[in-house]
From Swiss-Prot:
Residues 38-41 are annotated as: Interaction with substrate tRNA. This is tRNA dimethylallyltransferase. One of its GO terms (molecular function) is tRNA dimethylallyltransferase activity. Monomer. Belongs to the IPP transferase family. Its cofactor is Mg(2+). The gene is miaA. It comes from the Bacteria.
Length: 299
């Protein structure tokens, strides 16, 4: 299948919603490759905790944007957009269509919504100083510098608050003003999955992660990249590290990971509802509904 005009199909949804399996089924039917739009699966050695597609799954369909960067050299949104756009355009030249899959809403928006993030590298000294400030005070500071971003970023989301402040102090410009929109050179079809049993799916998948070796994977990351690796704050890895350090036990690590993942899923659903115009698929008939939408879109 090769459409007359390049087509990007974006399959989005909260974490643990079954996107990976559905994407593979869709890709097989329409003979497309898959681009994983995930802010963590792009890193080498972070497999179990990011629910990265397995080697068997990746052997069924070509997957791109997986295992691209070292955890010790994290990239920002601008870097990801540049890497991903090059890969997507190369794929579109060959096949005429491709499939994006992910739960990282901002990363998806950067690719299919024409978002143009600021090319401001992390400011290490400034970031270290900001991390010493209480979250409440950080958010108050952001309100003074960039009121619009302060409205959009949750007071507890210190990572995004610090990033917005970095951009302001490095450029003198508001993060919200820097993110201009530019036209994208392809057509986009947005599909979404949001199963009713999401919470039980999250619980089951989290338990599987720990059983498959999340603790051991975290230990390997610490041994390879150091105990202060920033990406160890990621959901799952953070709890595993706390358990390794003796701060919490196994049951507490599991419980906290499930709780944080449910909170993430809630934020993701809110983002997709407000920022995208997806056709939401019925979970029981997701594949036929997705294929029907794709064929209708292609005309």
């Amino acid at each position: 299948m090769q459409p007359n005009k390049p087509l990007v199909i974006a399959l989005m949804g909260p974490t643990a919603s079954g996107k990976t399996e559905l994407a593979i089924d869709i890709a097989k039917k329409i003979n497309s490759n898959i681009h994983n739009i995930d802010s963590r699966q792009i890193y080498i050695d972070m497999d179990i905790g990011t629910a990265k597609p397995t080697a068997v799954q990746q052997s069924q369909v070509n997957h791109f944007l997986i295992d691209v960067c070292l955890p010790s050299k994290p990239i920002n949104l601008h870097d990801f957009q540049s890497i991903a756009q090059t890969s997507i355009e190369r794929d579109l030249e060959k096949k005429g269509l491709t499939l994006l899959v992910g739960g990282s809403g901002l990363y998806l928006q950067a690719l299919i919504g024409g978002l143009n993030p600021p090319a401001v590298p992390p400011q290490k000294f400034l970031r270290d100083q900001l991390k010493k400030i209480d979250k409440t005070e950080l958010h108050k500071l952001l309100k003074l510098c960039d009121p619009f971003s302060a409205q959009r970023i949750h007071p507890e989301d210190s990572i995004r608050i610090i990033r917005a402040l970095e951009v302001f102090y490095a450029t003198g410009k508001m993060f919200s003003k820097e993110k201009n929109m530019t036209p994208i050179p392809w057509r986009v079809l947005e599909l979404g999955v949001n199963p009713e049993n999401l919470i039980s799916r999250i619980q089951r998948r989290t338990e599987e992660m720990y059983k498959k070796g999340l603790i051991e994977e975290t230990e390997d990351l610490i041994n390879k990249y150091g105990k202060n690796l920033q990406l160890l704050k990621t959901i799952g890895y953070g709890e595993a590290r706390s358990m390794i350090n003796g701060k919490i036990n196994y049951e507490e690590a599991l419980e906290i990971t499930i709780k944080r993942t449910c909170q993430l899923a809630k934020r993701q659903k809110t983002w997709f509802r407000n920022k995208h115009h997806s056709k939401w698929l019925n979970n029981e008939n997701a594949l036929p509904e997705a294929l029907t939408s794709i064929y209708e879109f292609l005309g």
